[in-house]
Amino acid sequence: MKLFLVSLIILISTQIVKAEINQLFIKNCATCHSVQKGDKTLRAGPNLWGVVGRKAATETSYTMYSDAIKKSGIVWNEKNLNKWLTNAGAFIPGTHMYYMQADESVRLKIIDYLKTLK
């Protein structure tokens, strides 16, 4: 019985954390970005499915990348995503995205969420 209760608590806690991270993504990113595998719906930003580990400006269904991001040569790893989400325009001047998230805990949760999209 104790094992069942502990398992249930862990399951519920995990679901609460997933829901919180999903809400953070919706609030901060979903207006401009899809995260559905294969979604080619035109939005203000590229689909973020599989973004972690991908070279910037290579999501083929998105065609509105700035020259600055095309020429950046960066790969979206945790370090680069954190800099990008802190201040995209300062990290890659000339980009079309001007998102800034001062709260590091929010940035890290969004990055953790993006890492699951594969």
Give residue ranges: language-model regions.
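Sec-dependent signal peptide recognition
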Residues: M1-L8
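Residue-level detector of functional hotspots within protein domains
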Residues: K2, C32-S34, L81-L85
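Sec/Tat signal peptide C-region and signal peptidase I cleavage site
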Residues: I12-A19
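Generic alpha-helical secondary structure signal
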Residues: A19, Q23, P46, K79, ...
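Periplasmic/extracellular electron-transfer cofactor-ligation site
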Residues: N22-K71, V75, A88-F91, L117-K118
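C-terminal capping alpha-helices of c-type cytochrome domains
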Residues: V75-K118
